[in-house]
Amino acid sequence: RQMCIRDRFLFFAVCAFSVYANAQNRTGDCTSYTSDDRSVTFYLNDSSAIQLRLCSQSTVRIWFSPDGSFQRNNPSFAVVNEDLEDVGTVHVDEQNACYEIFTPKLRIRVNKSPFNLQIFDKYQKLLFSDYADKGHISNGQRKLEYKTLRRDEHFFGLGEKTGKLDRRGEAYKMWNSDKPCYSAVEDPLYKSIPFFMSSYRYGIFLDNTYKTEFKFGTESRDYYSFEAPGGEMIYYFIFGKDYKEIMKQYVDLTGKPIMPPKWALGFAQCRGLLTSEKLSYEIAEGYRKRGIPCDVIYQDIGWTQYLQDFEWRKGNYENPKKMLADLKDMGFKVVVSQDPVISQANKRQWEEADRLGYLVKDSTNGRSYDMPWPWGGNCGVVDFTLPAVADWWGAYQQKPIDDGIAGFWTDMGEPAWSNEEQTERLVMKHHLGMHDEIHNVYGLTWDKVVKEQFEKRNPNRRVFQMTRAAFAGLQRYTFGWTGDCGNGDDVTQGWGQMANQIPVLLSAGLGIIPFTTCDITGYCGDIEDYPAMAELYTRWIQMGAFNPLSRIHHEGNVAVEPWLFGEEAEKNAKAAIELKYRLLPYIYTYAREAHETGLPLMRPMFLEYPADMETFSTDAQFMFGSELLVAPVVKKGARNKNVYLPEGTWIDYNNKHTAYSGEQWMTVDAPLNTIPMFVKQGSIIPQMPVMNYTDEKPVYPVTFEIFPAAAGSETTFSLYEDAGTDLGYLRGEFMRTPITCQTTDKGYTLKVGTRTGEKYSLPGQRNLMFCIYTEQMPRTALLDGQKIKKTNVGKLEENRETEFTITAWCPDKKLGTCLLRLPDDGKEHIIEFIY
C-alpha cells in the first residue's frame, strides 16, 4: 500500500512537472483581448498577458507579463517619451485564427493558437515575428523572447561592444564591467545599451536594466533570442526606412543628445598621473611652444586630496585658481575626474554621508556598504538614486568649478570592481532597488546628477562631462569614452588593439553616443622605447583625429605627448591634429545634426549605404559625416590600405583631383604621413584656419571646398554656427548659412543662401572663401549678374582676416582650382562661373 501511494505520488509529481515544464517552453493560446486608446492587451490561457502599445505609426511597445499584472518596480530610466505621435484609437480586426491591427506604416498580426506576433510593413513584407510557439517564455523571474531569424538577416548595435559590427552569430551580455586593458573580444564592457537594429529595417530596444543577454543565432540558425533574469520584459519595436530613421525614433523615445562645448571637439591631453600644477604647466607650454593645437588638459583622479572631496591635493597644487587662470589665458580648458564614492579615509565626508543615509546599504546588515576600491582604500558608494543626494553632491562638485575648471570626466561608475563574477556586490541596496536592478543604471543616475547640478549652479553654461559607465539614454546627460583599451603585453605591438577601437567607436555611435573617444595611444602598457613606438603612435593619432572628443591618454605616469616620439612622429601627429582643427566647421555642423537626430559623426559605412551588403563587414574604415570616408592604417609597417568605395565617384582627399569609381575594393598608398581619405563627388567641406585652440579667434574666414557634382546635379551644405559654450542652441540661438553649387554645361552656379537665425549673430565681420576643384577653368565670374574682378592667389589671400570689402576670384589651372573671396553680409548671392 505504501508502495502504491509512493508510486502514485511520483506519477502525479512527474505529470505536474511535465505540465509546468511545458508551460515554460511554449507560449500560451490567446483567449481574449481588451483595448484602451493606444494599447491592446491580449490574455493567454496560461495566465500571462501581452500588451501592444502604439507609440507612433512605426513604433510599438511590447510588454510580456507572465502573471498579467503589468507592474514594474521603477519607471523607465531610459524612455522619456513613448507617445511619439497621435495614433488615434487603436482598432482591432478579429478573425477566426488571428487579430490584426493596422497603422499607415505597419500591419500587426497576432495569431491566436499559440499566441504568435508578426509585424509586416505596409507592402506586406514580413519584418519581425515570434519564433514558432516559443515567442514569449518565462521561468520564474527569467523571461525569454525568441524571434525568427532569416538566413540573410544581419544585426548591428548594442552600443559600445568589441568585435565585428555585424552581431550575427555572436552572443552578448549587458552588465557594466570594469575591464582594464580589455582585449579585442571582451564582453561585457563598461556600458549597457540594449538597442540593436536588423537589416530587415527594424530596431529593438529592450527596456530592462538587469543583466540581459542577446544571442543572435548562437543557439539555432532559425531563431535569435534576448532574455532578462529579472524585471519586466518590455521592449520597443521600431520600424524605419533605413537605419538613420530607426535611430531617430529611438532618440525620440530616449531623448536628444546634448551638444558639447565647441572646445571639446578639439584635442585633449591626459595621462594617469597628470595630477600636478607643475606637469600641467609643462604640457601646456610644450603644446604652445611647438604650435600643436590643443584645447584641453585633463587631471586624473589623483588631483583630489581624498575620494571624493573635490579638494585639490596639497603638495601637488600650490595655487590651483592661478593655475586654472593661467592655463585659460593660454587657451586651455581643464577637466578633472570624479569617482562616485567616499573614501573611509576621508573621515569627515564619509561620516556626513553615512549619517545622512546617502550611501548604498548592505542589505545583510543595514549599514553603509563597505566597497573595496582600486585606490583610496575602502569606500562608501554614493546612492545617486536617492533624490536628496543631488544637491549634496552638486555643492561639492561646484567647488572646483568655482576655481575655474571646465568640466568633469566621471570615472569608475560601473561601479568599479562589481563585475559579473563579483556576486558579493549583489547585496548592495539602493534607494530604488537591489543592485541586480540598479547596477547597469548606476552610472546613468550619477551622470544625471552631475549634469543637472552643473546646469543648476552654472546657468546658461554648456556642461562637459565624459563618462565610462552608462545605460541607454546617457546621451541626455553626458558624452563617452571607450574605457581602458589595452595594448597587449608589449605596448609597441598594440596594433590589434588600435584596430579594435574603430568598431568599438562605431558601435558606440550606433548606441547614440555620438560624442566619444578612445584613449588615444591605448591606455595600458609602459613605454620603455619611444622610438620603437613612433610608428604606432603616429597611426593612433591619425585615427584619433576623427574621434569626436579626441583625447590622448595613457596609464600611470607614462608620458604620451607628441614631441616625445621623435621629430617625424611629432610632425605627422601635428599634421593630423591640424587637419581636425581645419575641419571643425564641418565637425560642428555634424555635432548639431547629432543633437537633432542622434546620428554619430563617426559612422559605419552601412549607415550611409544600407543597401550595399559589402559595407556590413567594413569594420576598418568609416564615414565621417556624410561626405568623407576615412580608412586609417592599423597594421604595423603598412604603407598602403585596402579600402572599399561604395556607390558614386570618390576623390582622393589627399590630392583632391584623383577620382575613382565606387562599388569596388582598391589598394591606396598610405605612407606614414598620410591618412587614407576620400570625399564623395558632390560634396562641400567647410574649413577654418588652423588655430592653437578652437576659440583663439572669435571670428575667422570660412573656406568651402567644393567638389562639384556631375553635370545637371547640385551640391549642398548648410553651415551651422552658434556661440559654442552656452545653452542658446536649445533656444534657437544659432544660424545656418546654406551653400549650393550647381553644375551646368556652361560652368558652375554657386548660391550663398540668406543666413537664417535672427537670435544669434557673428561677433564680427568675416570673408567667405570658396575653392572649387575643377579640370575645366571658367573664363568669367559674375556676382549677382555683375562681373567679378580677377586676381592672383596672393592678392586673394591678402588681409582676408582684416579687410572685408574685396570680392575677387582666381582661376588656377595649375592647381585645378577656382577660388573666390566674398565678404559675408548674410544675404543671398548668386555667383556664376562661366567657361
Locate predicted features.
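Short, small-residue-biased leader/transition segments that mark boundaries at the very start
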Residues: 1-5, 450
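Bacterial Sec-dependent N-terminal signal peptides
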Residues: 6-27
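N-terminal processing/targeting junctions
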Residues: 16-19, 587, 778
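N-terminal accessory segment at the very beginning of proteins
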Residues: 22-263, 270-272, 276-285, 296, ...
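Catalytic-domain carbohydrate-binding cleft regions of carbohydrate-active enzymes
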Residues: 125-674, 679-680
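Solvent-exposed, conformationally flexible loop/turn segments
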Residues: 637, 662-663, 822-831
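Aromatic sugar-binding surface patches on proteins
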Residues: 812-816
